[in-house]
């Protein structure tokens, strides 16, 4: 469950290391984001020479959450960290590599490019 002011690790090679959530997209009163939901965030920590700089406002999709999520078959999935992938305006990932596993929910929400770049889909 990601909400305003939540900090997430960035799971791609855009140069950002950590982002802070500004807003959860998808409705005026929406409070929480889970795997596959899009957020607006600001870059809090970045490496020099990367595509994004500290202070940039970006859109990102959540790919891992610590809070468990119940799947339709009754199983639960949870990860060791909260992580996101930075997006371009057309919804494609800005980076060219994805680090770590991603949730299968991304396939249902039509983030096929992220699913194909990810080393593992759980």
From Swiss-Prot:
This protein's UniProt keywords: Ribonucleoprotein, Ribosomal protein, RNA-binding, rRNA-binding
Biological processes annotated in GO: translation
Family: Belongs to the universal ribosomal protein uL14 family.
Protein name: Large ribosomal subunit protein uL14
Lineage, opening ranks: Bacteria, Bacillati, Actinomycetota, Actinomycetes, Micrococcales
Subunit and interaction comment: Part of the 50S ribosomal subunit. Forms a cluster with proteins L3 and L19. In the 70S ribosome, L14 and L19 interact and together make contacts with the 16S rRNA in bridges B5 and B8.
One GO CC annotation: cytosolic large ribosomal subunit
Pfam family, one: Ribosomal_L14
Gene Ontology molecular function: any one: large ribosomal subunit rRNA binding
Function: Binds to 23S rRNA. Forms part of two intersubunit bridges in the 70S ribosome.
UniProt-listed PROSITE patterns: RIBOSOMAL_L14 (PS00049)
């Amino acid at each position: 469950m990601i909400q305003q002011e939540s900090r997430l690790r960035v799971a791609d090679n855009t140069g950002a290391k950590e982002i802070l959530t500004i807003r959860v997209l998808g409705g005026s009163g929406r409070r929480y984001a889970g795997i596959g939901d899009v957020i607006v965030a600001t870059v809090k920590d970045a490496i020099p020479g990367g595509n994004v700089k500290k202070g940039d406002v970006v859109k990102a999709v959540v790919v891992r959450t610590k809070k468990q999520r119940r799947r339709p078959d009754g199983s639960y999935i949870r990860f060791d960290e909260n992580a996101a992938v930075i997006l371009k305006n057309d919804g494609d990932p800005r980076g060219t590599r994805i680090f770590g596993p991603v949730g299968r929910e991304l396939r249902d929400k039509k983030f096929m490019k992220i699913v194909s770049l990810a080393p593992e889909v759980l």
